[in-house]
């Protein structure tokens, strides 16, 4: 209901597991939303952040035609069936600020005229911001968070969910940023997983490591 009414969410629960599971579960079950899950684990530069964003949107294979057309003006290899290789920035955009391009990529979702509400699910953002600060400096990291905040203010239809296994407070302190870059997000704490959620998570984890997810093991 929060998302339907225009609230953007910051998943702040301290537990390391469950937030990503919740987002993927939400995306698969909730009608009326078109969800785009973006994982920023392993991102160390603003350019990486941009590429990860665009790549995830394209691979979802449910981008509205207008948004995909916009991405094709920025990147090569956007047609997965024709160009299976990684997307790359077009030559004439090599000198364009990646923060500007990030804005162009994500605002394209706001042009969707479908009834479904677009939801951008950004996972492991604190880790990426921390890595960018280490690699490119605190100002580059801060500009990413400022860009994302401006996007949340600018877009009318898009909803945003931001989370990560590393707390934002450590990242903000390290880069001398204030909570102001996040204060437009509503903090949502999960608390413990329900019994059914815990079983479903255990089931998926066992499948992920090639184990038989039988009930006896899961119940333990």
Segments (PLM) and residue ranges:
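Pre-Walker A adenine-sensing motif
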Residues: 1-3
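P-loop NTPase nucleotide-binding core
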Residues: 5-135, 158
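Alpha-helical scaffold elements adjacent to nucleotide-binding pockets in ATP/GTP-utilizing enzyme cores
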Residues: 22-26, 48-56, 143, 147, ...
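Flexible, glycine- and charge-enriched loops at secondary-structure boundaries
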Residues: 95, 137-141, 195
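C-terminal alpha-helical "lid" subdomain
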Residues: 103, 115-119, 210-211, 215, ...
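Sensor-1/coupling segment of RecA-like P-loop NTPase cores
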Residues: 118, 127-128, 137-176
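A short helix-turn-beta junction within AAA+ P-loop NTPase domains corresponding to the substrate/partner-engaging
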Residues: 175-191
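Conserved small helical "lid"/interfacial subdomain of P-loop NTPases
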Residues: 189-218
């Amino acid at each position: 209901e929060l998302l339907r009414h225009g609230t953007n969410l910051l998943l702040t629960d301290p537990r390391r597991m469950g937030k990503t599971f919740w987002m993927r579960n939400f995306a698969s079950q909730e009608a009326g939303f078109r969800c785009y899950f973006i994982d920023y684990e392993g991102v160390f530069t603003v350019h990486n952040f941009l590429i990860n964003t665009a790549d995830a949107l394209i691979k979802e294979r449910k981008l509205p035609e207008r948004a995909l057309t916009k991405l094709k003006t920025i990147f090569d290899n956007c047609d997965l069936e024709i160009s299976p290789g990684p997307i790359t920035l077009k030559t004439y955009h090599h000198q364009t600020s990646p923060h500007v391009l990030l804005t162009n990529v994500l605002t394209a979702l706001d042009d969707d005229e479908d009834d479904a509400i677009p939801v951008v699910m950004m996972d492991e953002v604190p880790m990426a911001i921390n890595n960018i600060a280490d690699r490119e400096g605190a100002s580059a990291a801060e500009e990413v968070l400022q860009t994302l905040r401006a996007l949340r203010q600018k877009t009318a239809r898009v909803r945003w969910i931001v989370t990560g296994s590393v707390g934002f407070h450590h990242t903000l302190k390290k880069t001398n940023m204030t909570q102001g870059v996040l204060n437009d997000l509503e903090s949502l704490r999960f608390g413990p997983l329900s019994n059914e959620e815990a079983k479903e998570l255990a089931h998926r984890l066992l499948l992920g490591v090639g184990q038989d997810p039988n009930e006896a093991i899961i119940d333990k």
